[in-house]
UniProtKB/Swiss-Prot annotation:
Residues 1-474 are annotated as: Adenylyl removase. PANTHER family: BIFUNCTIONAL GLUTAMINE SYNTHETASE ADENYLYLTRANSFERASE_ADENYLYL-REMOVING ENZYME (PTHR30621:SF0), GLUTAMINE SYNTHETASE ADENYLYLTRANSFERASE (PTHR30621). Residues 480-988 are annotated as: Adenylyl transferase. Coiled coil: none annotated. It catalyses: [glutamine synthetase]-O(4)-(5'-adenylyl)-L-tyrosine + phosphate = [glutamine synthetase]-L-tyrosine + ADP; [glutamine synthetase]-L-tyrosine + ATP = [glutamine synthetase]-O(4)-(5'-adenylyl)-L-tyrosine + diphosphate. Keywords: ATP-binding, Magnesium, Multifunctional enzyme, Nucleotide-binding, Nucleotidyltransferase, Transferase. Pfam families: GlnD_UR_UTase, GlnE. This is Bifunctional glutamine synthetase adenylyltransferase/adenylyl-removing enzyme.
Length: 988
């Protein structure tokens, strides 16, 4: 192609010609080869002009190579339709985007059925997603133009779909619209766009948050049609058309859970019930959510009228104490990120992590809620517009506005680039340095270091401004002359406690009097008592910020009573307000951790380590810490006690990080497993040396510890025991040990295993290391404690039940010599990859039924055993591995999520099923991690404290607990349906 022809193909206004900036390549040769291989398969009449355009525009060429290297999602869009790519590159993106929306609207208007509408909308989504991504990557559009385009796409999708559905209803005679071409007008059906969609700030792979209302006297409804069933059916159709996953993808995931009381209300609500709810029961988060609400589809006039009626709920006229308490409520949602002294770039969540997008949004929304009632100009939806008005009204400095605005735009670009990789609604940077290096190049940086420098600067800046907003004591109570020892007769003290938010001031005052009188063991030392008395005012104000202040006082009182020594603890708390906040959270939400702290106050040392809020330690760092802990132990008993203390501290620190939201539950699971694995290996070595010193060795002896269950799959919780199997081998010709007290083969290893179990389970003042369960060994309780390798192999090959092979999919050798490890892994792989008939589904179904009979499956919050719970997902993953491993050994994985990913990738699990099972497993795991940490018995929502419910809501990424419970129920139903279809069962 000649240069003039190329120039003619590329107008100055085209996307290709305007491609000014772009990514950098991580592996240039490989990226270039991927593009070349792709173009080699493209018809010549398309490949030549694409190649010519790319050669004419070097930035574009590099960007296409980077997409091939870093973004499977975008590269799939490119490969799916080369003609579409060429058309986008040659056209002006602004007019092309508008033309795409118009053409889609016209196609939907003439569509004959729902299937055609779904296909048309998905073609629009694919083209828009590619076009918007290229405009973002190439620097054609600033981030606010990108978010507006994404929002326009979502709004148009909702409007087109709703119009199609209402036209169908009109054709059936159920509504009589005055304008058949626009049946939504005067329909009484209101669709509110919430969150980022309402503000024109939608992110690249975002869900769309909608609330649907209807007027009971909807004027176009036929007289014989009941409003609620009709509008619920339309809403369900809207959701189905937009989010149902098909071979050609989906349009938008739809979230309807921001409506009032979603667990017990239909997906469409009457405006009368909505107004009644917001007036009587509306909560702080709902006020904040309504700041961004916008009538986006349906009867927009009625929607705007509804928002006007809701406005008094959102915008309060007076800044009374209750309003200030609401503001602190919002602050506490972000409180979990206070106290972080460093940010770990790897694995950082740019939305809700320290210094992230959410802090900027809360910074603006908090002040909007405070002042928006008296200053209507603050009632704006976009975050940056709110910051601008706050600066103009002297609520914040212009420097703060500029810095927060710059950070917001930078972090939104990071968020988009993360989501472009795989079209997933994630906000978290990769976990490894190498992966962040690749991401940095995709984002346009020359190195991870350069990207990290800018990222950290923005995060630190945001956190600084956010923290300053809440400095000082907004209630003014700190200046009052309070006698904290005054007791229940002191009216000034009682008034002060009420003002702080205590509901039982008499009880709190009596407790304070006991504290100040030094009646507890740790307060007998005068210096400690004096330090504590000075600390009480700050303590009582900090505990007042708990969700249940009175319970927090009781929990701290129990801690004081249980402490044998505590001067250093009180000193630490009195000098570190953030540490006190963290301890208040622990005491309020996780009494189990509070009891641990009372028994071993020294485990708090880890909380003041500057690295505590940084990246989770890897195995190498854990090994170094463990070695340092044990370095000068003087005896076997002291060695084990130090191990117990190390284990207790590790559990406490990881648990505290879960509660504070500074580590994901997935990261916590791996951390729990890494700690356990390090301890198991250490105990194995220690017991081996001690045992050999007594009984000697058997020639060529080997021992290995095989981890099963949650340790094997690296999915541990704070309450997990250790499922272990000990496997051994030795020279058959010389079966006796060579020590002074010689033992014969099997007896030697049985006694060794007993010694090992004792080291784990013996309780001392430092607690126990772990509870150990060895029932997964061959023949269970009826079999020997330890298994010789050839006996283990024979049992698995000949005698093992199907359930034992299911369990074996999680088996992982965690302590052994490299040679013995390899032999065991070979045996396990041979067992798992032998041919099996799909008829083993009957065995799996019978096992599931037996478990249900024994454990029950009707408790929604028994996340493991409930119908559609984690056991169902585990069985699906394990069943698919057993059935297909013979022909597809790559399906094998010890972790459930990895097994699901493998099964989907290999085509033995339908992608829609995988798309249900993955988030279900993550949800169950996230919630289980919290429940195991905080609840020692069955979880009962009706008796659970607000602190725990709040942590669960955050873990489940829900607006409130009722929404979370609704999501759990819905998820269990979906999982059980898949289980029944793949494996069988009645689903009861």
């Amino acid at each position: 192609m000649s240069s003039s022809a190329i120039d003619a193909d590329i107008s100055p206004a085209s996307l290709a010609a305007r491609f000014a900036a772009g990514p950098q390549l991580h592996a240039p040769d490989e990226a270039e080869k991927r593009c070349a291989d792709w173009l080699a398969d493209v018809p010549a009449e398309l490949a030549a002009p694409i190649r010519a355009v790319a050669d004419r525009c070097p930035n574009l060429r590099i960007a296409l190579q980077s997409i091939a290297e870093a973004s499977p999602y975008l590269f799939d869009l490119i490969r799916a339709d080369p003609a579409r790519l060429l058309r986008l590159l040659r056209s002006e993106p602004e007019t092309g985007f508008r033309a795409l929306l118009d053409a889609t609207a016209a196609a939907v208007a003439t569509a004959s059925d729902e299937a055609e509408v779904m296909a048309v909308l998905r073609r629009m989504k694919a083209e828009a997603a590619l076009s918007i991504a290229l405009c973002d990557i190439g620097g054609l559009w600033p981030v606010l133009q990108v978010t507006q385009a994404l929002t326009d796409l979502a709004v148009q999708s909702v409007q087109m779909t709703l119009r199609f559905l209402l036209r169908q209803e009109a054709a059936r005679g159920r509504i009589h619209p005055p304008n058949p071409d626009a049946p939504e007008e005067r329909s009484g059906l209101i669709v509110l766009a919430m969150g980022k969609m309402g503000a024109g700030e939608l992110n690249y792979s975002s869900d769309i948050d909608l609330i649907v209302f209807y007027e009971l006297d909807a004027p176009t409804l036929a007289p014989d049609i009941e409003p609620q069933p009709f509008f619920v059916r339309v809403t369900q159709g809207l959701s189905r058309i937009l989010q149902q996953r098909r071979h050609d993808g989906y349009v938008f995931r739809v979230d309807l859970r921001l409506r009032p009381d979603p667990a017990s209300t239909p997906v469409a609500l009457s405006t009368a019930s909505a107004l009644n709810y917001y007036e009587r029961e509306g909560r702080t988060w709902e006020r904040a959510a309504m700041i961004k609400a916008r009538a986006c589809a349906g009867d927009v006039v009625a929607g705007e009228a509804l928002l006007s009626e809701i406005a008094p709920f959102v915008w309060r006229k007076h800044l009374d104490f209750a309003a200030l308490s609401d503001v602190h409520d919002m602050k506490r949602q972000m409180q979990t990120f206070r106290g972080q002294t460093e940010v770990a770039v790897e694995g950082h969540n740019v939305k809700v992590g320290r210094g992230g997008i959410r802090e900027i949004e809360f910074f603006a929304q908090t002040q909007q809620l405070i002042a928006g009632g008296r200053h209507p100009e603050l009632r704006v939806r976009p975050t940056l517009a709110a910051l601008d008005i706050l600066a103009n009204r002297d609520w914040i400095t212009f420097q703060a506005r500029d810095e927060l605005s710059a950070a917001y735009q930078f972090l939104r670009r990071v968020e988009h680039r993360i989501q472009m990789i795989a079209d997933e609604q994630t906000h978290t940077l990769p976990d490894s340095i190498e992966a962040v290096e690749r991401f940095s190049r995709f984002f346009g940086y020359a190195s991870r270091e350069a990207f990290a420098r800018d990222l950290l600067a923005h995060l630190d800046c945001v956190q600084g401004h956010y923290s300053k907003l809440f400095e000082g004591d907004p209630t003014g109570t700190a200046k009052l002359p309070i006698d904290y020892a005054g007791g229940a007769e002191d009216t000034v003290l009682l008034d002060h406690l009420r003002a702080l938010g205590y509901k039982k001031p008499l009880m709190v005052a009596t407790t304070l009097q006991q504290w100040m009188a030094g009646g507890y063991r740790i307060l007998k030392v005068e210096a400690t008592q004096r330090a504590f008395n000075d600390f009480v005012p700050a303590l009582i104000e900090e505990l007042a910020r708990a969700e249940e202040p009175d319970n927090a006082v009781n929990a701290f009182d129990r801690l004081l009573q249980a402490l044998h020594r505590g001067g250093r603890l009180i000193s630490l708390l009195s000098q570190n307000r953030d540490l006190l906040t963290l301890i208040a959270l622990v005491l309020g939400a996780a009494p189990r951790l509070g009891d641990m702290l009372a028994r071993q106050p020294q485990i708090m040392d880890g909380l003041i380590d500057p690295r505590f809020f940084g990246a989770m330690p890897d195995r190498t760092e854990l090994s170094a810490r463990l070695a340092a802990t044990l370095s000068d132990a003087g005896s076997y008993e002291e060695f084990l006690d130090r191990l117990r203390l190390f284990g207790q501290e590790s559990l406490f620190l990881i648990g505290t990080r879960i509660l504070s939201g500074t580590v994901s539950t997935q990261q916590a699971s791996i951390a729990f497993a890494d700690v356990a694995e390090g301890i198991v290996g250490t105990v194995h070595d220690l017991v081996s040396k001690q045992f050999v010193s007594q009984y000697g060795r058997i020639k060529d002896q080997e021992t290995a510890i095989l981890a099963m269950g949650k340790l094997g799959s690296r999915e541990m919780t704070a309450a997990s025991d250790l499922d272990l199997i000990l496997i051994y081998d030795f020279d058959h010709e010389q079966p006796d040990s060579d020590g002074e007290r010689s033992l014969h083969g099997a007896q030697y290893f049985a006694r060794f295993t007993q010694r090992l179990i004792s080291a784990f389970t013996t309780r001392t003042n430092y607690g126990v290391l772990y509870d150990v369960d060895m029932r997964l060994r061959p023949s269970g309780r009826a079999g020997p404690l330890a298994s010789r390798l050839d006996s283990f192999a024979e049992y698995q090959e000949v005698e093992a039940w199907t359930w034992e092979h299911l369990a074996l999919t999680r088996a992982r050798v965690i302590s052994a010599s490299p040679e013995f490890r390899a032999r065991i892994e070979q045996v396990i792989r041979a067992v798992l990859t032998r041919p099996r008939d799909a008829a083993i589904a009957n065995d799996v179904a019978e096992m599931r039924a037996a478990i249900a009979q024994e454990k029950g499956e009707g408790d929604v919050w028994d996340l493991k055993y409930a119908a559609g719970g984690m056991v169902d997902i585990d069985f699906i993953a394990q069943y698919l591995q057993l059935v297909h491993a013979a022909t597809m050994p790559d399906i094998l994985a010890v972790g459930t999520l990895s097994a699901i990913d493998n099964a989907a990738r290999l085509g033995v699990l339908a992608q829609p099923d995988a798309d249900v099972l993955r988030p279900a497993a993550r949800l169950y795991h996230d919630l289980t991690q919290i429940l195991r940490l905080c609840v020692s018995d069955k979880f009962k929502p009706e008796t659970a404290g607000d602190d725990l419910l709040r942590v669960l809501v955050r873990a489940g990424d829900a607006p409130d607990f009722s929404s979370l419970q609704a999501r759990v129920k819905e998820t269990q139903a979906e999982v059980r349906a898949i289980f029944n279809r793949l494996i069988g069962g009645n689903g009861e």
